A protein has these predicted regions:
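Helix-start/capping segments and mature chain N-termini
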Residues: 1-117, 138, 145-354
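Extended, Lys/Arg-enriched charged tracts that mediate electrostatic binding to polyanionic substrates
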Residues: 126-136, 140
Length: 354
């Protein structure tokens, strides 16, 4: 794929790491590529970061024809830059496109686009411990009509944001609350797709949890309101009597790349792993009896976020004395070591941008 590159005439500078939050600072450039039913994907380009123009009737603004991904670029100790399993993100992006009726991308072209814009803005990849360059690929429908039909015009874009360390004071466990009113998704819906509507619709429950003193919610299935599905924006895992249990991918849960990586790591260590239905009753019985030894959320942003307490109605149980568990810490250390290039990568997960 031929990508034209137009560089900015007013380059910015990477702020100090202690001034980096998440998603508030953006690099100098972005990638754009357009789609039309008659031309297919065309006009791949890296251009200066700036506003995007579209018709007020664009389908994304009215019917939510949008999907996105979240991934990172990491600065290695030798100064090089690498990605972590980017082909998994590209595959998931295409699955999301299929579900939302959006045009899919050639996987090689999508990866080339990501690597190219990261390479152009390579000087924006921070090097301090725990920092990274967050990558947000997204794809949206631009048909200039209010007619409700499949997408005939679209844009694929990639923007970049240098991000600070998620845990500035170490891995501090957080309390989470079982959500009993709202549901995130149902089988046959868009729960397995990474689309904006899933996240926007979750805000109300997240706000309620924070008002009650919790960090985020723990979602239950949308039919029986009985089975644990995932955290507010991440997958979840529980160590129960020595076995790591994580909700099965039933079609309403996001297929997390970090989740998949953790399962492969755990199995390589000989740790029993079960992907299955886990009822909230079973989970809280395990918490009450002490069988629940560790719990953590898992995803791209935090990698591992230990759960220190579980709330459900009038019940609230502390987990592992509100401390990060040994296995949670080991997973975090191994995953981040591979991502930042401080540990060997026996799985072939990393992808240099060169």
């Amino acid at each position: 794929m031929n990508i034209t590159i137009t560089k900015t005439t007013h380059p910015g500078t990477l702020p100090p790491s202690d001034q980096l939050g998440f998603g508030t600072v953006f690099t100098d450039h972005m990638f754009l590529m357009d789609y039309s039913a008659d031309k297919g994907w065309h006009d791949a380009r890296v251009v200066p970061y700036g506003p995007i123009t579209m018709s007020p009737a664009a389908s994304v603004l009215h019917y939510g024809t949008e999907v996105f991904e979240g991934m990172k670029a990491y600065r290695r100790p030798d100064g090089g830059v690498q990605l972590f399993r980017p082909w998994e993100n590209v595959a998931r992006l295409n699955r999301s496109c299929e579900r939302l009726g959006l045009p899919q991308l050639d996987p090689d072209d999508a990866l080339q686009a990501i690597k190219t814009v990261v390479k152009v803005d390579e000087n924006w990849v921070p090097s301090d411990p725990g920092t990274s360059l967050y990558i947000r690929p997204f794809l949206y429908g631009t048909d200039p009509t209010l007619a409700l039909h499949g997408v005939h015009e679209a844009t694929f874009a990639v923007i970049l944001s240098p991000s600070g360390s998620y845990f500035k004071n170490g891995l501090q466990p957080v309390p989470i609350m079982v959500e009993t009113e709202d549901v995130r998704a149902v089988r046959g819906g868009t729960g397995e797709a990474k689309c904006g509507g899933n996240y926007g619709a979750a805000n109300r429950a997240g706000d309620r949890a924070i008002e009650k003193g919790f960090s985020q919610v723990l979602w239950l299935d949308g039919v029986e309101r009985k089975y644990v599905e995932e955290g507010g924006g991440m997958n979840v895992m529980f160590k129960i009597n020595g076995t790591v249990v994580t909700p099965a991918l039933t079609g309403s849960i996001l297929r997390g790349v970090t989740r998949k990586s953790a399962i492969e790591l755990l199995k390589s260590w000989g740790v029993p792993v079960e992907e299955r239905l886990l009822s909230v009753d079973e989970l809280f019985d395990a918490a009450a009896s002490g069988a629940l030894e560790e719990a953590w959320c898992i995803g791209t942003a935090a990698v591992i976020s230990p759960i220190g307490a579980l709330g459900w109605g009038d019940k609230c149980y502390e987990i592992n004395h509100n401390r990060i568990g040994e296995l949670s810490q080991k997973l975090y250390d191994e995953l981040t070591g591979i991502q930042w290039g401080t540990k060997p990568d026996p799985f072939g997960w990393v992808c240099p941008i060169d």
